[in-house]
């Protein structure tokens, strides 16, 4: 049985700012772009969250909810430095580390001899060490199943941890909402609910053939996750190459104005996801994807140095006009391709 830990730093960017400037500690603060530039919130501290300020929220909306919000532009070198220190702490316990972003990672401690091999104690010690050496708090999930570790790390935030033992997995899954499973969005959740499927326990009673017919290969993933099956390794060689976000509509759209409105809603989430792995927003390419009512899809992208909404909208409009051919559109997606480390190093040296 594996021992998987998911460590997630608490409001990481904001926490670094509060650590370095204690005057910010008890007031609402957020990291993000200015209202004038139509920016979005990258992260907010807990005092700001009490007012409803959330990640990926337009800055203008955040300031309406919390007029006295202190908005900071971000110090990404400081965040990267802290992230590297945290990664070094992880490496004291295991070499099997899969970073998901600057502020979260999976650790496989199955073979670790630290803390007498107790994953629970290892997670506690890692969190204590992070606080001792960086004055930052982290939350953790400890489970034998990879995807459950990420869910568990959110259960006792902030500055806590949640353990699901092998004996507890089955009972935990019985009542786990399907919307908690990675990949289950609002549209999929609505389709599942229409089938009477709301929890993993419900899916356990469902015929796999029905799920495959309705959802294709994702139906199998859904069935496996609901059984507590996740055989993916914690991949220490994992190098993220792209970041994307997409939306499948409940009904096909036929007008450009509808597509543009969807892009406006998707863009802040793309920006938030990119900021977690690439705070400076430097990229190699960006592009759009459209899937039509006949299930054919098209992607168009081009070289672009930094995430840019206006360019994405222009690319989408060109794709809409030239490739739709009167068909309805059932999915709209935005994505960026990240710079490979060698290319990024050359770019930095060139600057």
From Swiss-Prot:
<dbReference type="GO" id="GO:0003887">
    <property type="term" value="F:DNA-directed DNA polymerase activity"/>
</dbReference>
<dbReference type="Pfam" id="PF11799">
    <property type="entry name" value="IMS_C"/>
</dbReference>
<keyword id="KW-0808">Transferase</keyword>
<comment type="subunit">
    <text>Monomer.</text>
</comment>
<comment type="similarity">
    <text>Belongs to the DNA polymerase type-Y family.</text>
</comment>
<feature type="binding site">
    <location>
        <position position="8"/>
    </location>
    <ligand>
        <name>Mg(2+)</name>
    </ligand>
</feature>
<comment type="function">
    <text>Poorly processive, error-prone DNA polymerase involved in untargeted mutagenesis. Copies undamaged DNA at stalled replication forks, which arise in vivo from mismatched or misaligned primer ends. These misaligned primers can be extended by PolIV. Exhibits no 3'-5' exonuclease (proofreading) activity. May be involved in translesional synthesis, in conjunction with the beta clamp from PolIII.</text>
</comment>
<dbReference type="GO" id="GO:0003684">
    <property type="term" value="F:damaged DNA binding"/>
</dbReference>
<dbReference type="InterPro" id="IPR050116">
    <property type="entry name" value="DNA_polymerase-Y"/>
</dbReference>
<dbReference type="GO" id="GO:0009432">
    <property type="term" value="P:SOS response"/>
</dbReference>
<dbReference type="Pfam" id="PF00817">
    <property type="entry name" value="IMS"/>
</dbReference>
<keyword id="KW-0963">Cytoplasm</keyword>
<keyword id="KW-0515">Mutator protein</keyword>
<dbReference type="InterPro" id="IPR022880">
    <property type="entry name" value="DNApol_IV"/>
</dbReference>
<feature type="site" description="Substrate discrimination">
    <location>
        <position position="13"/>
    </location>
</feature>
<feature type="domain" description="UmuC">
    <location>
        <begin position="4"/>
        <end position="185"/>
    </location>
</feature>
<dbReference type="InterPro" id="IPR017961">
    <property type="entry name" value="DNA_pol_Y-fam_little_finger"/>
</dbReference>
<dbReference type="InterPro" id="IPR043502">
    <property type="entry name" value="DNA/RNA_pol_sf"/>
</dbReference>
<dbReference type="GO" id="GO:0042276">
    <property type="term" value="P:error-prone translesion synthesis"/>
</dbReference>
<keyword id="KW-0239">DNA-directed DNA polymerase</keyword>
<protein>
    <recommendedName>
        <fullName>DNA polymerase IV</fullName>
        <ecNumber>2.7.7.7</ecNumber>
    </recommendedName>
</protein>
<dbReference type="GO" id="GO:0006261">
    <property type="term" value="P:DNA-templated DNA replication"/>
</dbReference>
<dbReference type="InterPro" id="IPR053848">
    <property type="entry name" value="IMS_HHH_1"/>
</dbReference>
<keyword id="KW-0235">DNA replication</keyword>
<keyword id="KW-0460">Magnesium</keyword>
<keyword id="KW-0234">DNA repair</keyword>
<keyword id="KW-0548">Nucleotidyltransferase</keyword>
<dbReference type="GO" id="GO:0005829">
    <property type="term" value="C:cytosol"/>
</dbReference>
<keyword id="KW-0479">Metal-binding</keyword>
<dbReference type="InterPro" id="IPR043128">
    <property type="entry name" value="Rev_trsase/Diguanyl_cyclase"/>
</dbReference>
<feature type="active site">
    <location>
        <position position="104"/>
    </location>
</feature>
<dbReference type="InterPro" id="IPR036775">
    <property type="entry name" value="DNA_pol_Y-fam_lit_finger_sf"/>
</dbReference>
<dbReference type="InterPro" id="IPR001126">
    <property type="entry name" value="UmuC"/>
</dbReference>
<dbReference type="Pfam" id="PF21999">
    <property type="entry name" value="IMS_HHH_1"/>
</dbReference>
<keyword id="KW-0227">DNA damage</keyword>
<dbReference type="GO" id="GO:0000287">
    <property type="term" value="F:magnesium ion binding"/>
</dbReference>
<feature type="binding site">
    <location>
        <position position="103"/>
    </location>
    <ligand>
        <name>Mg(2+)</name>
    </ligand>
</feature>
<keyword id="KW-0238">DNA-binding</keyword>
């Amino acid at each position: 049985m594996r021992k998987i830990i998911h460590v997630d730093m608490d409001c990481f960017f904001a926490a670094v700012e509060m650590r370095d400037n204690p005057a910010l500690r008890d007031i609402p603060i957020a990291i993000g772009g200015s209202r004038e530039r139509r920016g979005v919130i990258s992260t907010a501290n807990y005092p700001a969250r009490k007012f409803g300020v959330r990640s990926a929220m337009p800055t203008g909306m955040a300031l309406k909810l919390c007029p006295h919000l202190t908005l900071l532009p971000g110090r990404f070198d400081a965040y990267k430095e802290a992230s590297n220190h945290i990664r070094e702490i992880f490496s004291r316990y295991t070499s099997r580390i899969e970073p998901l972003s600057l502020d979260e990672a999976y650790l496989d401690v199955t073979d670790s001899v630290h803390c007498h091999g107790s994953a629970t104690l290892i997670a506690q010690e890692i969190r204590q060490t992070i606080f001792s050496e960086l004055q930052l708090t982290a939350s953790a999930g400890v489970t034998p199943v990879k995807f459950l570790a990420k869910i568990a790390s959110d259960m006792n935030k902030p500055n806590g941890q949640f353990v699901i033992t092998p004996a507890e997995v089955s009972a935990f899954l019985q009542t786990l909402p399907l919307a908690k499973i990675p990949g289950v969005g609002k549209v999929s959740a609505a389709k599942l609910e229409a089938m009477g499927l709301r929890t993993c326990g419900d899916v356990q009673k469902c015929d796999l053939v029905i799920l495959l017919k309705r959802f294709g290969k994702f139906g199998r993933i859904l069935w496996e996750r609901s059984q507590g099956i996740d055989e993916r390794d914690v991949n220490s060689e994992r190098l993220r190459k792209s970041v994307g976000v997409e939306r499948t509509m409940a009904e096909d759209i036929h007008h450009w104005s509808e597509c543009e409105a969807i892009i406006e809603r998707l863009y802040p989430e793309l920006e938030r996801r990119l900021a977690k792995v690439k705070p400076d927003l430097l990229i190699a390419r960006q592009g759009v994807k459209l899937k039509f009512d006949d299930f054919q899809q098209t992607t168009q992208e081009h070289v672009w140095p930094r995430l840019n909404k206006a360019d994405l909208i222009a690319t989408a409009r060109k794709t809409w006009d030239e490739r739709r051919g009167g068909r309805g559109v059932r999915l709209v997606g935005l994505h960026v391709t990240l710079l490979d480390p060698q290319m990024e190093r050359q770019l930095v040296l060139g600057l």
